[in-house]
Structure formats: structure tokens, C-alpha cells
Amino acid sequence: FFDVENAPKVIGGRYGLGSKDVTPTDIKTVFDNLTSENPKNNFTLGIVDDVTNTSLEKSEPIKIAQPGTVRCKFWGLGSDGTVGANKQAIKIIGDNTNKYAQAYFAYDSKKSGGITMSHLRFGDAPIRSTYLIDEADYIACHNQSYVNQYDLLKGLKDGGIFVLNTIWNEAELDQYLPAKMKKFIAENNINFYTVNATKIAQEIGLGSRI
């Protein structure tokens, strides 16, 4: 388009850097950039570039909830059986019900003993969300040590369900759960459940697989 009269302005950017996911909010951010007075060219999505400042400032988060679709996130530990169980669960739903089903799995660099994330969606309508879950109906954490390491409840919707695998009793929960987590549970009407799945697994001969 060089030297062409009334040439269009071409704006480009990159996404997926560092294996970062691209969400509907990111897409909206791109369009907000394009319609701004001085759109940024050669931008990056998903990362915070504090060196060359190519990243776009995120727009107001948008939530695209598909009616009738259940969205679940599971925090697990590598080789604890969480990923395998979720693969079986989503296969059973897809093969034996009339529901549509989708699953994504994310891992860290460790093959065993590292963090795992399972993202499951199932519902009555076709699922077209090609990104990890950013708003969940149900979140489960299968390793109690994560409560002080990660923002486990980020994205859990108001009135959602949180299940924690833990050996702590009620008094210990009050002692060990971070204040930020307790505040979120109270303010967002979260249904909070605990289960000692580790003990149950040992008693029935499953070992470390919960």
C-alpha cells in the first residue's frame, strides 16, 4: 500500500508469546487499540512487556457465559491422578450423554510433582470457546499447599463451588487459609467444601492417586 492514495493504515501485533492464552478480553483489547486515536503498532498480547513496552493495556474484562454450559477447573499435582481422572470423566460425558464436552490440560515443566491444571466444559450446546476457562462454576484444589502459593479462586463466579482436598479440620482451616481467600469466599457467596481425599485413596489402596 506504499505510495497509494488513501492507503489503509495497517496495524499488526503478536499473540501467544510465552504460551499465553488469548481470551475474549484480549480480542476486545485489540479492537479498542484499533479504534483509539493513536493505535499502537507491532503490539503484543498476553504478556506484560515492561522492557520495550509493546504490550497493550487490557480492556475491561468481559465474560462470555454460554447458557447451560458448566465450566470446571481442577488444580492438581503431577502424577496424583487428577489429569487422568478428568480425561476419563470428560470422555464419559462425551460418549455416554447428549452433552457436548471439551477439555484442556496445562502442565508446568516437571513431568511428575509439578502443578497441573484441568479445564473442563460440558453443556447442551456446541462449545466454541477455544481458550482456557477464565470464569468457572466449579473449582477444585487437590493439594492444600496451593492455598498459599496461587490465587486458586480467581475467576470463580458468584455463588460458585470450591472444593479443597485437605487434612485440616475446621479450626485449622480458619488458621491456615489466607485472609484474602476467606474474604473472597464470604463476599462472593462461594459454596466451600472440604474432603480428605488423600486419606480415602490410601484406605482403598489407590496410594497417592486421589
Where do the protein language model's features map onto the residues?
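Active-site cofactor/cluster-binding pocket
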Residues: F1-F2, S19, G68-G78, V83-I210
